[in-house]
A protein has these predicted regions:
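Extracellular lectin-like interaction modules
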Residues: 1-218
C-alpha cells in the first residue's frame, strides 16, 4: 500500500497493522506536509508490517516533519524493515518506547527528538543507521535513556548526529546503551562530541567501535 500526501500531510490516530500474517508493506510518501502516527504500528495479533517506508524521497520540497509512536513491542517486531525520512526532513520525533524490526532500520532528518520514556530501538541481527541532513542532533527528553540493540549477530550501528541529553527538568542524566553484538559501532559526528550534554552512563558493545569525536558525560 502506498499513500502519497501533499502540503496537507497525513495524520493517523489509530493503530496500523498488516492483514494477519501477511506482512503487507506500507509506504507513506509525504512532500512538504507532516506525517503523524499516534497509534502503535504492527502490534496487532500477527499484524507486523513488511517494509515500512515514510518520507524517503530526496525531493527539494520534501521537508515535512514526521512523528511516530511505537513500532512493535519489546518482544515482537512491528515491521520487517523501517526506513523513515530524508536529508530534508525537518524534525523526526519518536514519541513511543519500542521501535522493533526484524530487518534493518534507517532514520534520516535534520533533527531528531526522542520524547518517549527510555526508548529501545532493536533489530534481529540487522543494521541501525541514523543519518542527518544538516548539523542536527538526536535529543533525548529529560530522564529518558536510549538503548539501541541489533541482537547478538552482526548488525552494525552507525550514527551521524550528536546524541544529546536534556538539561534542566528532573535533571537526571540520560544513559545510553549501544549493543551491536558481533557487529560494529560507528559514531560519525565531527566538529562536536559524538555524545554530549547531560549524559550519564555510556555503554558501547561491538567488535569494532569507531569514534570520530569525543564523548562527554556529566
Amino acid at each position: 500500500l502506498t499513500l502519497t500526501t501533499g502540503g496537507g500531510g497525513a495524520s493517523f490516530s489509530s493503530t496500523i497493522n498488516s492483514q494477519a500474517s501477511q506482512a503487507r508493506a506500507l509506504t507513506i510518501a509525504n512532500t512538504d506536509g507532516a506525517v503523524s502516527v499516534s497509534g502503535a504500528i504492527g502490534t496487532g495479533t500477527n499484524g507486523a508490517l513488511g517494509a515500512l517506508i515514510i518520507g524517503t524521497a530526496e525531493a527539494a520540497g520534501n521537508t515535512g516533519n514526521i512523528t511516530l509512536a511505537a513500532i512493535g513491542t519489546d518482544s515482537a517486531a512491528g515491521a520487517a524493515s523501517i526506513t523513515v525520512g530524508n536529508s530534508r526532513t525537518g524534525t523526526l520525533t519518536l514519541g513511543g518506547v519500542e521501535y522493533f524490526s526484524t530487518g534493518a532500520q534507517t532514520w534520516e532528518s535534520d533533527d531528531f527528538n526522542l520524547t518517549g520514556a527510555d526508548i529501545t530501538i532493536q533489530t534481529t541481527d540487522s543494521n541501525v543507521t541514523f543519518q542527518d541532513g544538516a548539523a542536527g542532533q538526536i535529543v533525548l527528553s529529560d530522564t529518558a535513556d536510549l538503548t539501541i540493540d541489533t541482537g547478538s549477530g552482526a548488525g552494525n550501528i552507525s550514527i551521524a548526529p550528536t546524541i544529546a541529553g536534556t538539561t534542566g527538568g528532573a535533571n537526571r542524566s540520560e544513559d545510553i546503551t549501544l549493543d551491536a553484538g558481533t557487529g560494529n559501532i560507528e559514531l560519525l559526528n565531527t566538529g562536536a562530541a559524538v555524545i554530549a550534554t547531560d549524559i550519564g552512563d555510556v555503554t558501547l558493545t561491538g567488535t569494532t567501535i569507531s569514534l570520530y569525536d569525543n564523548i562527554t558525560t556529566t
